[in-house]
Amino acid sequence: LFVFYLINLIGVKEAAFVQKFMIVFLLLGLSTLIFFGIGEVNYENFESPEKLFPDGWYGFGLACVVLSFSTGGAQFISELGGEMKNPQRDLPRAMIFSTLLAAVFFTLVSVVAVGILPLEQTAGKSLAEVASAILPAPVYVAFIIGAGLFALATSINSTFTWATKSVLIACE
């Protein structure tokens, strides 16, 4: 936490540079899971509502909440409009591109997560269960670091970046 706090104290440009670096590793980690898993997917897991929604629509509703939380960062991009050279052009592009990119990765990772192992083995468990079943050991470790660690790190860094902007504006 302290490292991200310091980076954000230095400036938004530095925080953005670190963020881009970490997002590359996050996307590489998720891409690895997709690459190794997409060919192993059992598409029979998607054929019936009972297999997709074993707890009914409640589970689907929870998944929607998680998705909205995960893509909700796009709304906070507007907090950084004052830091941009051309916010009228860049804000909509950033919001649309980041949301579409997140949707593509969420969809592909979800297909792999649901389609590899039987539901009984994965229900209520983390993505690490599926990853350990399909990834070679060294790649699994890289996945945990790339996807797990950097997912958390990018969230922390971006929160420090946007959360203080409205307070700083009020102080001015």
For every predicted segment, state its role.
Residues 68-90:
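Juxtamembrane interface elements at the cytosolic ends of transmembrane helices
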Residues 96-157, 172:
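TM-loop-TM module centered on a large, flexible mid-protein loop between adjacent transmembrane helices
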Residues 2-6, 61-68, 143-157:
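Hydrophobic alpha-helical transmembrane segments of multi-pass membrane proteins
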Residues 1-40, 54-55, 95-100, 164:
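Membrane-interface loop-to-helix entry segments
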Residues 49-57, 84, 130-137:
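Helix-boundary and loop/linker segments of multi-pass membrane transporters
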Residues 83-87, 93-101, 158-172:
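Helix-loop-helix connectors at the membrane interface of multi-pass transporters/channels
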Residues 6-13, 31-42, 81, 108-115, ...:
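Structural signature of transmembrane alpha-helix termini at the membrane-water interface
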Residues 41-53, 119-129:
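Membrane-interface helix termini and inter-helical loops of multi-pass transporters
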